[in-house]
Structures are given as C-alpha cells and as structure tokens.
Amino acid sequence: MSVVKSIEVVLPQDAVYLAGSIIDGQVVLTLNSTLVDPVVKVELVGRGYVEWNEEIGETRDYSRDVICNNKADYVHKTKTFPIKDNWLRAGSHTFDFHFNLPPRLPSTFNSKIGHISYFVQALCLDREHILAKKKLYLLVQGISEFRQRNLSENSVSVEAEKKVSYNCCSQGWVSLHVQMSKNTYVPGEKVTFTSEIRNHTGKYIKTVVFALYAHVQYEGFTPSAERRRRADSSELLRQMANARIPAFNSTTVVSAFNLPLVLSVSSGSQENEIMRTSYELVVTIHLPWSLSTVKARLPIIITSTREGQADCPRLDELPYEDHMV
C-alpha cells in the first residue's frame, strides 16, 4: 500500500482569474502511514504552443509536409512547503499557498492548432521518487494593454444589399442594415444589435442567422527557422431568428447574446505572442429560392480591464435573445 493516499489542490470552483490577480488555494495531502523527509510543493505553470503542417516551398517536393510550430512560457513559479521536524504522520495535512499572476498574460485558449493553458500542480516526493501529484487547470483572462474608450462610445453600422432573381424571370432586391450602440466589449458582457431587413421580392424571407467568429492568426517556425503564419476561424456563438418577412415588406430584429466569460483580447503588441485574435459579428439572410445570401459583417473588439470585468454579466443571465419590432 502506498504511503500517500491522495493529494488534492483546492481552489474556488469555476473561478476566472484576471492577469495580475492573486491565486489563493490549498494543497491537501492524505497519508496512509508516516512519511519521513518528504518534499511537498506546488507549482504554477502557464505556457502556449501552436503546431500545424504545411507544404514546403515552390521549388521543392510538394509531396512532403513541414511541421511549423512555436511555443511560449508565460509563468513558472514554485512554492515548497516547510515540514516541521522533516516528517508527517498518517492522516490529512493542509498547506496554504498563494501565487501572484503576472500582469501581462494571454487568456486561456484552445483550438485544433494551438493552446494557451495554465495549471496549478501539487507534488509530494521522497528523496528519490514522486509519490503523488495532482494538476488543476485554471481559467485565466488576459488584460488589454490599451483602452478603447472612444470606440466604445461610438455606434457602428453596416449595410448590405443584393439584387436577386427568382422564379426564372422575376427580380428584386434584399437589403440588410445592422447597427450596434458600440463595438467594444469585455468578456461576459451582453452584446445587443438591431437588424433592419427590407424584402423587395415576391418571396418570404424565413430565417436570419447571427454568428460571432474568432479569426486567429498563428505564428510559427519551420525546422530551418523560417517564419510562417497560419490563419484559422471558428464560430463562437450562433443563433437563428424566425423572421418570416412577407413579400415586399420589412422588419426589424433586435438580438442579444452574452459573450463567453474568457476570451482572448483583440490583438495588441505583446511579447511571446504566438497568436493574434480578432472578432467579427456576421448577420446572414438565407434566400434558398434564389440560391444566394445577404451578409453584413461588423468587427467586434474585445478588451479586458479590472473595471470592465467587474461590471459584466455573469452566467445566471440569459445567453441570448431576439425579438421582432
């Protein structure tokens, strides 16, 4: 039977830690029997890694792929707990710890190409071996290096229009006007926008789709140290409104959704940056009877400050809603 029964890391459940904040927790070590000369410690680790395959240059063999990758170390701190008289009796022992997160950290992130992760790991060792360890991952929200106060106070709008053909010889047009009171938000905040749709065709418009996209540009290097970049997009949020706009009519749809509580901030310049992120709200009207769509795109800026995070909505609010006017 192992001398160590269990080792646990105790932290507030589902906590989101801002860069620059303090992590307070406990390590709980439970022993089956007396342990002599133990080492009990806890580590805070944050690192990022990206990797993808791409074809090598024009003059070379396209049948071969090259691996592009990059990594960054953001934080690595260790606390070793003092052990009185260098032994621990059987039973449970609790060790308190706290770590200060560095003020400049990227947010927790995960995709098929890259990840940025943070974790606290507790370890119990004797003179030669690791007897037990436990790792607990953290949610960390990065802080913006810049503030977008002027942008956040300005309304933004975009308009799209398309001429369409239907029923062989009929023609018309559909216009879409999307307006937001601002385009700068913090994670967890509610995003509200208005879509005005004008249907100058003889057909019904049934649905309108709203989606928030994250566009990420990764930076890596080949084995020969050549710099490479890779762009990728992912859909963070999606909702659909049953507009049902009659022929030659118009309507206004007011929509809202809550942003995720942890998001990469819109890219500024930062050391050890292995990826840059931008965001876009896309409103799409599907016109299946003409095999076409009308799309409006609005850039969204994500910032994060201590003041902004204190004011944003929490999980108990509705994630999204929409209604017609």
Curated annotation (Swiss-Prot):
GO cellular component: a single term: membrane
Tissue-level expression: Testis-specific.
Disruption outcome: Knockout of Arrdc5 in mice leads to male specific sterility. Male deficient mice exhibit oligoasthenoteratospermia, impaired acrosome reaction, impaired sperm penetration of zona pellucida, and defective spermiogenesis. However, Arrdc5-deficient sperm could fertilize eggs through intracytoplasmic sperm injection.
Pfam families tied to this protein: Arrestin_C, Arrestin_N
SUPFAM superfamilies listed in its UniProt record: E set domains
InterPro entries, per database record: Arrestin-like_C (IPR014752), Arrestin-like_N (IPR011021), Arrestin_C-like (IPR011022), Arrestin_domain-protein (IPR050357), Ig_E-set (IPR014756)
UniProt KW keywords: Differentiation, Membrane, Spermatogenesis
Lineage: superkingdom: Eukaryota
Record's subcellular location: Membrane
Gene3D superfamilies the record matches: 2.60.40.640
GO biological process, one term: spermatogenesis
Role, per record: Plays an essential role in spermatogenesis. May be involved in the anchoring of the sperm head to the tail during spermatogenesis by affecting SEC22A-mediated SUN5 and NDC1 transport and localization.
Family, as annotated: Belongs to the arrestin family.
Name assigned to this protein: Arrestin domain-containing protein 5
Species this protein is from: Mus musculus
Lineage start: Eukaryota, Metazoa, Chordata, Craniata, Vertebrata
